[in-house]
Amino acid sequence: MNPVWANEIYIGTSATSATPPVWTYEKLCKGIESVSFASNEQNQQYYFLCGNGFAHNEVTGAAPALTISGRRIKGDAAQDYVASKQFALGTDRNTSVKIVTAEGKQIICDATIGDVVTFGGNTLDVNSFSCVIYLNGEPTVTDVT
Protein backbone atom coordinates (compact mmCIF):
# COMPACT_ATOMS: atom_id res chain seq x y z
CA MET A 1 0.00 0.00 0.00
CA ASN A 2 1.19 3.47 -0.85
CA PRO A 3 0.08 6.51 1.16
CA VAL A 4 -1.19 9.55 -0.73
CA TRP A 5 1.83 11.59 0.41
CA ALA A 6 4.08 9.28 -1.66
CA ASN A 7 2.73 10.93 -4.84
CA GLU A 8 4.33 14.15 -6.05
CA ILE A 9 2.65 17.00 -7.94
CA TYR A 10 4.61 19.71 -9.74
CA ILE A 11 3.13 22.81 -11.36
CA GLY A 12 4.79 24.55 -14.29
CA THR A 13 5.63 28.09 -13.20
CA SER A 14 7.51 29.32 -16.26
CA ALA A 15 8.22 28.12 -19.77
CA THR A 16 10.71 28.86 -22.51
CA SER A 17 9.53 30.21 -25.85
CA ALA A 18 10.73 27.04 -27.60
CA THR A 19 8.28 24.77 -29.42
CA PRO A 20 7.34 22.76 -27.50
CA PRO A 21 8.10 24.87 -24.41
CA VAL A 22 10.43 23.62 -21.70
CA TRP A 23 8.81 24.10 -18.30
CA THR A 24 10.30 24.93 -14.92
CA TYR A 25 8.33 23.12 -12.21
CA GLU A 26 7.72 23.80 -8.53
CA LYS A 27 6.56 21.05 -6.18
CA LEU A 28 3.01 21.62 -4.94
CA CYS A 29 3.00 20.04 -1.48
CA LYS A 30 3.34 22.61 1.32
CA GLY A 31 -0.03 23.15 2.97
CA ILE A 32 -1.71 20.54 0.76
CA GLU A 33 -3.95 18.20 2.76
CA SER A 34 -6.05 16.53 0.08
CA VAL A 35 -5.64 15.47 -3.54
CA SER A 36 -8.20 13.69 -5.66
CA PHE A 37 -8.02 12.59 -9.27
CA ALA A 38 -11.05 12.32 -11.54
CA SER A 39 -10.91 10.78 -15.01
CA ASN A 40 -14.18 12.46 -16.07
CA GLU A 41 -14.65 9.83 -18.75
CA GLN A 42 -17.18 9.96 -21.56
CA ASN A 43 -18.83 6.63 -22.16
CA GLN A 44 -20.80 5.39 -25.15
CA GLN A 45 -23.27 2.69 -24.27
CA TYR A 46 -24.71 0.26 -26.80
CA TYR A 47 -27.38 -2.41 -26.45
CA PHE A 48 -26.68 -5.01 -29.09
CA LEU A 49 -29.18 -7.69 -30.00
CA CYS A 50 -26.76 -10.46 -29.00
CA GLY A 51 -26.23 -8.82 -25.57
CA ASN A 52 -29.53 -10.21 -24.32
CA GLY A 53 -30.54 -6.81 -22.94
CA PHE A 54 -27.17 -5.99 -21.36
CA ALA A 55 -25.06 -3.01 -22.40
CA HIS A 56 -21.69 -2.83 -24.07
CA ASN A 57 -19.63 0.21 -23.01
CA GLU A 58 -16.80 2.05 -24.73
CA VAL A 59 -14.88 4.89 -23.11
CA THR A 60 -14.53 7.41 -25.93
CA GLY A 61 -13.07 10.41 -24.17
CA ALA A 62 -11.74 11.83 -20.93
CA ALA A 63 -11.18 15.20 -19.26
CA PRO A 64 -8.90 14.30 -16.32
CA ALA A 65 -8.58 16.75 -13.43
CA LEU A 66 -6.82 17.01 -10.07
CA THR A 67 -8.65 18.67 -7.20
CA ILE A 68 -6.21 19.99 -4.61
CA SER A 69 -7.03 21.52 -1.23
CA GLY A 70 -5.36 22.51 2.00
CA ARG A 71 -4.02 25.62 3.72
CA ARG A 72 -2.60 28.73 2.08
CA ILE A 73 1.16 29.00 2.56
CA LYS A 74 2.23 32.44 1.35
CA GLY A 75 5.81 32.40 0.09
CA ASP A 76 5.61 28.86 -1.29
CA ALA A 77 6.54 29.16 -4.97
CA ALA A 78 3.96 26.65 -6.25
CA GLN A 79 1.07 28.04 -4.20
CA ASP A 80 2.04 31.63 -5.01
CA TYR A 81 2.00 30.80 -8.73
CA VAL A 82 -1.44 29.18 -8.51
CA ALA A 83 -2.73 32.08 -6.38
CA SER A 84 -1.49 34.57 -8.99
CA LYS A 85 -3.93 32.99 -11.48
CA GLN A 86 -7.03 33.52 -9.31
CA PHE A 87 -8.40 36.36 -11.43
CA ALA A 88 -6.62 35.56 -14.70
CA LEU A 89 -8.63 34.46 -17.70
CA GLY A 90 -8.05 32.58 -20.93
CA THR A 91 -4.56 31.42 -21.81
CA ASP A 92 -3.14 33.19 -18.75
CA ARG A 93 -4.37 30.15 -16.78
CA ASN A 94 -2.44 27.67 -18.95
CA THR A 95 0.46 25.72 -17.46
CA SER A 96 1.92 22.24 -17.35
CA VAL A 97 1.55 19.64 -14.63
CA LYS A 98 3.90 16.81 -13.75
CA ILE A 99 2.74 14.01 -11.47
CA VAL A 100 5.03 11.31 -10.13
CA THR A 101 2.93 8.51 -8.69
CA ALA A 102 3.82 6.21 -5.84
CA GLU A 103 3.46 3.37 -8.37
CA GLY A 104 6.43 4.67 -10.37
CA LYS A 105 4.67 6.51 -13.22
CA GLN A 106 5.42 10.03 -14.39
CA ILE A 107 2.52 11.89 -15.99
CA ILE A 108 3.16 15.16 -17.81
CA CYS A 109 0.45 17.19 -19.50
CA ASP A 110 -0.50 20.68 -20.57
CA ALA A 111 -3.03 21.98 -18.08
CA THR A 112 -5.30 24.81 -17.04
CA ILE A 113 -5.56 26.09 -13.47
CA GLY A 114 -9.17 26.57 -12.37
CA ASP A 115 -11.37 27.29 -9.37
CA VAL A 116 -8.57 28.97 -7.38
CA VAL A 117 -9.38 29.71 -3.72
CA THR A 118 -6.80 31.56 -1.61
CA PHE A 119 -8.72 32.47 1.52
CA GLY A 120 -11.64 31.42 3.65
CA GLY A 121 -12.56 29.15 6.53
CA ASN A 122 -13.39 29.58 10.19
CA THR A 123 -12.09 32.74 11.85
CA LEU A 124 -9.36 30.93 13.80
CA ASP A 125 -8.22 28.77 10.86
CA VAL A 126 -5.32 29.36 8.52
CA ASN A 127 -6.71 30.52 5.17
CA SER A 128 -7.86 27.76 2.87
CA PHE A 129 -6.24 27.00 -0.47
CA SER A 130 -7.66 24.97 -3.31
CA CYS A 131 -7.65 24.64 -7.06
CA VAL A 132 -8.52 22.28 -9.85
CA ILE A 133 -5.87 21.39 -12.39
CA TYR A 134 -7.57 20.43 -15.65
CA LEU A 135 -5.42 18.32 -17.97
CA ASN A 136 -5.45 19.55 -21.57
CA GLY A 137 -5.00 16.84 -24.16
CA GLU A 138 -3.44 13.42 -23.85
CA PRO A 139 -0.88 13.10 -21.05
CA THR A 140 2.54 11.57 -21.57
CA VAL A 141 2.92 8.63 -19.18
CA THR A 142 6.33 7.05 -18.61
CA ASP A 143 7.91 4.73 -16.08
CA VAL A 144 10.14 6.44 -13.52
CA THR A 145 13.54 4.77 -13.39
Task: Describe each model-derived feature in a short phrase.
Residues 78-110:
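Short, acidic/charged, Gly/Pro-enriched secondary-structure junctions
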Residues 25-27, 97-99, 103, 119, ...:
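Homeobox/homeodomain signature
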Residues 1-73, 112-127:
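Solvent-exposed edge beta-strands and adjacent loop segments
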Residues 72-75, 138:
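Acidic glycine-/aspartate-rich tracts in secreted/extracellular proteins
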Residues 35-38, 100, 129, 144:
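Compositionally biased, intrinsically disordered low-complexity segments
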Residues 58-59, 88-94, 119-122, 134-136:
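Short, surface-exposed linear patches
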Residues 109-145:
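Mixed-charge, glycine-accented linear interaction segment located at domain edges/termini
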Residues 65-69, 96-98, 110, 130-134:
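Beta-strand secondary-structure signal
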